[in-house]
Amino acid sequence: MPYLTSTGTARRTSGAEQLGFGVPGCAHPLLAPAEWAELARPGTPLHWAVLDIDDGPGIRPDPHCLEAAGRLRNARERAVRGEDPLDSVRASAGRLLGRLDLVHGSRPFGDLVADAQSYLDWYRVDGFYLDRCPAGRPDLPTVRRLTGTLSALLADSGSARHGGHLVLGHDTHPHPGYAEAADQLVTFRGAWTDYRWSQVAEWTASYPPGRFAHFVHGVPRTHLEEAMRIARWQGAGTIFFTDRTRETDPGNGRGQSDPFATLPRYWDEIVSRIGPAISE
């Protein structure tokens, strides 16, 4: 695993620090209406959810996605105004992120910026999820250029609160320099069988848990508590754990199965374990 070091002196989070959900790839709202409704439900400790229409924003506004985006935005705004004291969708949470596929650094800069502008114009997204982001040092200047441009677009759009939110989907520990290029890094995405024996890069201890996210599939219900302990120990504040697997769940349209396309069967239980988010 790139840039993985000993965990000997790493600072870990305390059990008291609250986890929240990052939802990396819910299926299209037409196929998963119940899932999108759950994300906007009061009491769900949602940090953010990713919107992906057709491997990007598509060629025109999608009415089903417009409705889902509006529902999530309205839930967040109600919470910000304090209309529902138990609603987890706070000023810094419940964000809607548009998915941009960097294809490990091979996607042209202009195409990514054009997709980002479409997300902003049509869906008023709060930020972007940069999927398949490179992790090596040579690609760092290119990624920094992109995140700087995206931050400027978000600031100009007026739709994103506090300048928007950028997440880099490395799915592994990247070069430490990436930590200054975005708001959050996905440093693990994979199977439970790998996660339960995983290690953490020591440099991550210099940052708060809100800077890192872990996505794990194939987590048995009986191991939820263990999975949450690992996330806290490794300093990840945003998680998505599911019992679904690549072998048993539907494809993502590219001939691959996607265990993150729907919510886990124990969704209500994991929401209860984490509890509603606390107002900031």
Where are these regions (language model features)?
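Glycan-processing catalytic domains of CAZymes
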Residues: P2-E280
